[in-house]
Structure formats: C-alpha cells, structure tokens
Amino acid sequence: MQITSALTQNKMDPINGNLTSTAPVEPLSLTAAEQVGGAFCHQFYITVSENRKAITKFYGHESKFYLDDQVVTGSQEIVKLYNHLPETTHFKIQSIKGYPTPHKQGVIINVIGTVNLRPFLQSFLLGQQGQKKYYVESDAFQYIDKFFVANTEKEKTTSSTGHNGHASGANGKDSKSSKTEQPKEQSKPAPPKQQTPKKAEDRIVKQDTPKSVEKEVAKTPQKPQLAQQPPQQRAPVPEPVQEQPKVQKTWANLVGGGGKSQPPQQQSYGQGQQIHQQTQMHHMQPSMHQQQQGSHAPLYQQQRQSHPANELRQAQESSDANLNERKIYLGGITREIVPSNTAQAESEIKQVFYKYGEIEEVRMPRKVLDSPNDTSKHAFAFITMRNKAGVKAIFEAATKDEQGVWKLPLKLDAFGFDGHAQISEQRDQPQGGGFRGGRGGFQPRGGQFFRRGGSGGAPRGGMRSGFQNAGQN
C-alpha cells in the first residue's frame, strides 16, 4: 500500500505483492504511524465487506495470515481463508492504534471492534517498500468473546467454594467476621438523626417504644407556638380586628339557634387567638384566589406550547429542513465505461467523499446505465451527508467557474471518469420540473404557479398543456 500525500489525504495504494524493499529515508513518528493505520483500516475493511476478492492487493507473496489456529502464506491463500468469515459482514471498529516498529520503518496496527456483533482483535504488521509505500507482512485475526466466557465460568466456581472446599469459609472462621460487622451496621443509621426535624419525627412515629411517644408529646406543642409567633407580629397591621365581633352578632346568635350557640362559648376560652387566626384567614383568602388564578394562566400557556401535536409538527419541519441542507447533487460524469450495476460506483463515491465527513447515503438511479453506447449521456448521483459540516467541507474543496457552477475533481473507475464533476445543493422541486445539473428552481410553499398562457386566466391549451410547460421553465 502507498500513501501519496505526506500522510495527510489518507489515501493508500496497494503494491500488488511486489516485495522489493529499499532503505527508508526518514523515520516514522507516532502521529505518522497513527495516520497510516487509520488510512489502511478504512480501505481494508471496506474492501473486505464489499469486494473480498480484491484484498490480494494488500498482501505480498510471502505475507502470512493467522486465523485462530490456522496459518496460511500468500495472497491467494489468505483470500481463501478470509472466505471462512460470514458472507455479509458488518464491521464496527472501536479502536485503531498505530505504532512505529524499531526496525525496517514498519507500522504495527492494533484493531479492536466487532464483526456481526462478535468482538474481535486484529493485528497488522506493515512493512515498508520504498518511501511511503507499505504492504502487510503479517495479519492476525482472533475472536475474543470465548476467552471472557471461560473466565466468568471460572470465577463462578471459585466464588461458590471457600479455601478448603467449604461454602461457609475457611475452617469455619466466618462467624467471627459476622460478629465484627454487626456494630458497623448499627453505627450507620446514626448520621441521619442530624437531618431536619421533620424527617426525624417521621422515623420516630414508625417506632412503637414508649420513649418515642414521649418525644412526640414534647414536640407537638412546639409547632403551634412557632406558627402563632408570626401572626402576633402581623396582628397590629390590620385594624379590622374589632369589627369581627359586630359581624358575628347576627339574629341567630342573639335569639339563640340551639347548636349555633357553641361559637360564643368557644370564644370565651381563647378569643384572642381565634380572632387573630380568623382575621388572617379572612385576609389570606383573596390573595390565595389571586395566586391560583395567576398560576392557571402560565400552566395553560405551557400546555398549549407543549402539546404533542405541536412538538411533532415542529420536529418534522426541523428534520425536513435539516435533511435538505445535507443533500448534495453530483452530476456531469461522462460515461467512458458503463458498468453492469451501480453498486461499484456508489462504493467509490463513498470512499472519495469519506474524507469530507461521514456519509449517510449514496443513491445512483438505475437509468444512468441506459443506452451504454451513447457517450453523450452523463451519470449522476445523490449524496446525503451525516451533518452540515461535511457539506461545507465539500464546497470548500470545490471551485466555481465563470458561469457560477461548482466543480469538484473526481475519479470514478466504474465509468472511466477522471475530471471535474458538478456539485450543487439538492432542493425540493415543483411537480412539473426536474433536477438537471442545477437547472430549474425551488417553488416555495404557497407561491404562484408559472403559466405559459399569460398573466391572467387559464394557461393556453388547457390544464394539461399548462402542467407540461411548467417543466420547461
């Protein structure tokens, strides 16, 4: 394999098994080794997943591959042994570490990840062939899930038995340890007693001892005293305290209404305290009503704002807008060669645009393969990036010509294309129009419909001709 741009573009070319090595010019640094490892693993695992027969370009005639207990030599034998892996493989790489070797200026790469949800460990030894050229000297692949299963079974067996094979412990000495642990367990509940008095009272109520009953009796009269102190300070402020006895002198109280004569008897015992409480309740009721009415208004507004239908609609609008900003149209690809399918071209586009950012989808319509003998037709594709930063990086790498069209250098072996392709942001199109290399326009929601028949009235030729002419604008 080969790195062509001072380890910055992460592009590596295989050497097809040519093992004639030359002396290196400069030693590798740790950062350079990590860049070599990242670029190699990106191309290697994509090739294993999509075109497994093409991995011969990474190995030489004397390269070795270790798969568990099997060892093979040579690129052809390595491909046969790689076929033991499942046909549909999904690699998920968790860690890639690259280290320079102390001799031959090689690179050691350790990879940890999962293939079809099964954890594995793979190590590569890259040998240097000339300046900035590498090939795989040795490759070791090993599943690691079986080792963890064996260790867990051993731990279970050791934990179930003691030192002398007894479950209770060694020589029955565990009884002492249980005694020593008891005072520690009793000392733990002590700190919660320093918490607030409300929590302490709740715990005391749960206990049925007579001491707890005495504590409750001693603490209960303190609460009304604390509650009565602030009313005594606020009592001088309101003056209508003297008016309440006049209000209570109704005809029912003067004549005598049987059970209604009890309130004046209760006032004789503690009229001062009860009058203060009644005046406070009388003044607090209107303020309580105002607070409740004021609290209902923001709650109603919050319920309207947090309605599920509104949130769903806002989420859909934001997701649609975000998706449109992440779509790119790639066109202007001349067809020197027409492949049998679009899979190879889509995979090549993924490899080229991966350096700009993560790719969510690459879609090439089937009709780009029509009329293979007609070289005037161009191929095109639709690319969806994972985030907006990737789209921005693509347009920063492109250049704009005199006509305002963005051009991006591109090489696609599937179509034999090596030149500048056109790129533009993909937007929603009106019903009559189409996306043709940036031609056409975006029809906003609620806007006027283009008519060929004039400024007013129906279009010429009826509605049918009007829809046909809409795509020609």
Curated annotation (Swiss-Prot):
Residue span(s) of domain RRM: 326-420
Q: Where is the composition biased (Gly residues)?
A: 431-444, 453-464
Instruction: Output the Gene3D superfamilies linked to this UniProt entry.
Output: 3.10.450.50, 3.30.70.330
Q: What is this protein called?
A: Ras GTPase-activating protein-binding protein gtbp-1
User: Locate the NTF2 domain: which residues?
Assistant: 36-143
Q: Specify the taxonomic lineage.
A: Eukaryota, Metazoa, Ecdysozoa, Nematoda, Chromadorea
What this chain does, per the entry, is described as: Plays a role in, but not strictly required for, the formation of stress granules during heat, oxidative stress and starvation. Does not play a role in temporal patterning during worm development.
Amino acid composition bias (Low complexity), ranges on this chain:
221-249, 261-296
In residue numbers, the region (Disordered) covers 155-320, 424-473
| GO MF annotations in UniProt | mRNA binding
Say what happens when this gene is deleted.
Shorter lifespan at both 20 and 25 degrees Celsius and lower survival rates following heat or oxidative stress. Increased brood size. Does not suppress heterochronic phenotypes in lin-4(ma161) background animals. Reduction in the number and intensity of pqn-59 stress granules in embryos but does not affect granules formed by tiar-1. In another study, RNAi-mediated knockdown results in reduced formation of tiar-1-positive stress granules in response to heat shock or starvation.
Q: Which Pfam families match?
A: NTF2, RRM_1
GO biological process assignments: stress granule assembly
Q: Which locations, inside or outside the cell, does it occupy?
A: Cytoplasm, Stress granule; Cytoplasm
Where does it mainly reside?
A: cytoplasm
- The keyword RNA-binding is annotated on this UniProt entry: yes
